[in-house]
């Protein structure tokens, strides 16, 4: 049994053209994880007849447990990257909750902690978020509700992400992050590395 399990984990699932370090500045590994999460969850929802645009994906850097090697990526990487049983959830944030989220991200980024982020570019200056921060291509509209993709752990205030407590319309899924990563690799030969900035520190 151990030999057969080892053989499965040693299978090559994709090719990575670059090394992606889990602690790299601007977090390309986190950006990759956020982007695939948005795509996989939107597909999951569509299969259930739900058309929901996800504006932002936010996870925690502490949940990303290893780096991605350049070259062949083995199935074991999925379990090393994501050993937790985290499930995706969607929550709507607006106004002050969005500002609190930006401030949290800016403070952590200023000390070199870049949380996996998709759908936005956080601009920080002097340890605080700047109004140049954009969601999509647009600056924050405090009257608008934004749909944020995260995990059940963070929704409950994990990693001190307490701003999620001010969210509304929470939508739970039964899709685990690890399952989404596996599905991504099932239809991906060569990994696409995100090149757009998720953080800009001034």
What are these regions (language model features)?
Residues 4, 11-12, 190:
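Coil residues (strongly favoring Ser/Thr
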